[in-house]
Amino acid sequence: DVLAVGEGGLLGLAVDPLFATNRFIYICFSSGLNGANDNRLVRWRLAADLTQLTDRNDLVTGLPRISSGRHSGCRPRFGPDGYLWIGTGDAATGTNPQNPANLGGKVLRITRDGLGAPGNSLLAGGETRIYTLGHRNVQGIAFHPVTGAAYSAEHGPSFDDEVTKLTAGGNAGWNPVPGYNESVSMTDLTRYPT
């Protein structure tokens, strides 16, 4: 089921903080199953003898993917709040990062069952799982050890890599339109101040 092409393939893994009791692991990957051409997050249960994964549950599907696999993102991480955070890539498609109805170029925050977590800021016309938008290709999420504040790290276009403090409903500012204009700055603080 893993479609390993270009920047796509096995993209990320998170172990449930309650693993000792529920044995859940979460895997992000590029999928070609039954003609699918997306990135997705799947929850599995790891057998006690560590020999097999069972109880597959595709929690987040339809994360945008292009044939080269470029900007697939898909980095899952549990936060200190107990929710699963997932950084997604924009699939090198200019309209994805600022579109609240599309999961590309976002940070998602979900429950163990794949639903939008309480406290996500619903953007007009938006998807309930979106925590922030306006990202290019999130490669990591980290949490402050004392305050629990969330931060993302992402690649810029040959320069301009950035770390962004994440706030519910926030906008990281990546907006490479028209087309996919990579000469624009990663963050336009005038247009997207949060």
Label every PLM stretch briefly.
Residues 1-94, 140-143, 147-156:
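Acidic, Gly/Ser/Thr-rich repeat motifs that build Ca2+-stabilized beta-propeller blades
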Residues 3, 8-10, 18-20, 90-194:
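Beta-propeller domain segments
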